[in-house]
Amino acid sequence: MPPGWEWGEGMDENLVLKNRLREARAERGLSQAGLAELVGVSRNTIRSIETGQFNPTAKLALVLCIALDKKFEDLFYF
C-alpha cells in the first residue's frame, strides 16, 4: 500500500460495477432463469445484475465467472 493511502480514499461508494453478464449468458445459450438455477439465485437477481441495479457480492461474482467460464475482468468492469 502506498504511504499515506487509506482504504476507500478517493473511492465512490456508489460506483456501479458494470458487466457483460447478458452477453456471456447468451454465448452459453442460457436464459436468466437457467443461469439463476445454475448459480443458486433468483431470476430477478440475475436481471438486477444485468441491468446494473444490483452489484453482486464477491462470492456471487466468482460463481458467475465459474458458471460462464469467464475471467472476472472479462465479465465485470468499472
Say what each PLM segment does:
Residues 48, 77-78:
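Phosphate-coordinating loops and pocket residues in cytosolic domains that bind phosphorylated ligands
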Residues 19, 43, 58-62:
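Short alpha-helical elements of helix-turn-helix
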Residues 51:
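Short, conserved catalytic or interaction motifs in soluble domains
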Residues 26, 37, 66:
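Alpha-helical residues within the helix-turn-helix
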Residues 1-22, 27, 33:
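N-terminal flexible/basic segments that precede or flank functional cores
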Residues 59-74:
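DNA major-groove recognition helix of helix-turn-helix/homeodomain DNA-binding modules
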